Every structure is written in structure tokens, then in C-alpha cells.
Amino acid sequence: MIIGITGFIGSGKDTIADYLTTFHGYKRISFAGTLKDACAAVFGWDREMLEGTTKSSREWREQVDPWWSERLNIPELTPRWVLQQWGTEVCRNGFHNDIWVASVENQLRKAKDNIVITDCRFANEVNAIKNAGGITMRVERGDRPKWYDSAVAYNRGPNGNSNWALSKIKLDKAKVHASEYSSVGLKYDHYIDNNGTIDELHNQIEKLINL
């Protein structure tokens, strides 16, 4: 089985993946795995910290790297900013829209284990999992961001959507990166409510994988 998970930061994606790998033998891969490998090599950053699976690593990813910021004259240069820019603007937009999808597809065609992917951020990534025979889930926890409705409207596309252009303006004004809003409002196979206890979350996952 292949399971693709999407959700905002702190929604519980990593918690679900840890449960599946620990108790059900799933192997964890990610669309951004090779991107993080590259950034760790080029910028000399700790690879585990780039993963952002702990509170301390997520906080570190938001901190400006003083040496690189001064050297490249980019005041806002944080590890997370680099991942977004390199992953989307440089590689997706500048090289090929399917570069990260193809990288994961290459891993999937060789895989023999059950797979969990925790960083589905774009429609083509969600579709790739479905096309591979996998299932997708959206994890919800806490309040939705103020720009949520704008993201839903924008992701519907321009056809018959009078709010499309205005929605993009609102997202740009809110300084929301495409990797944060592009998964909002898409159709998923399952929706997970993670506003309860950890046991309640695990029970939802058990029911899902035993369908």
C-alpha cells in the first residue's frame, strides 16, 4: 500500500508516519527528500534538522543563516526559505514541473515495502500517488489559516471562477508560498481529524489501513 499525506505544519503528518513505520513496517519516503539532500550538501546544513520532524528543527528552519544571508545578500535566507525557493522556483518552475514526482516514482517502482509519503504539497504529487494505486489523506488540526478560502478558490482554477485572480492577489499579499497553499481544497480519499488524543488519531489510522 502507498499512503500520501498532506496537511499544514503541525497537523500530525509525521506522527502518522511514525506510527505506520513503527507498528506496521511502512517505509517512509518524501517528495522533498532529494531536495533536502542537495541543500544539506550545498549549504552545509544538518540533514536531520532540514527534515523538520521536531519542534527544535522546525524552529531552526525558520532562523536566518547569518553567513549565507550576508554572503548572498539575501536578508530572508532561512533553511525553510531555501527549500521553498530551490524546490519550487528553481527546480519545479525552472527545470521541470514533475522533477520531484519523477524522483519519487523512481523510488516507488523499485520498492517492495508499504510506503508512506508525508509531504504532498502540489496537485501533481497527489495525482502521482493515486496513479500509482495509492490512497491520499488530508490531516486537519487546529484553526485553518486566514488565507484558507483564498487558497481553495485559487486552486479551483480560472474556468468559471470569478474569484480566481483576486484569490491569487490575496495569497501574494499574505506572502504565502505555493508549497503551502497548493494542496488546499483538493480532493482526497480520506480526511483525518487530529483534534483529539493520540489514541484517537491512531484508531483512525488503524481503521483506514484495514478497509
For each feature predicted by the language model, list its residue ranges:
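Extreme N-terminal starter segment of soluble prokaryotic enzymes
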Residues: M1-I3
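Walker A/P-loop
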Residues: D14
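Hydrophobic anchor at the beta1->P-loop junction of P-loop NTPases
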Residues: I5, I117
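ATP-dependent small-molecule kinase phosphotransfer cores
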Residues: G33-D113
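Small-molecule kinase domains that catalyze NTP-dependent phosphoryl transfer to phosphate-bearing small molecules
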Residues: T6-I9, S103, N127-N131, V139-L211
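Short, well-ordered beta-to-alpha junction loops that form the rim of enzyme active sites
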Residues: D119-F122
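Short, well-ordered beta-strand core segments
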Residues: R28, I115, T136, Y191-I192
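Post-Walker A helix-loop "phosphate-sensing" segment adjacent to the P-loop in P-loop NTPases
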Residues: T22-I29
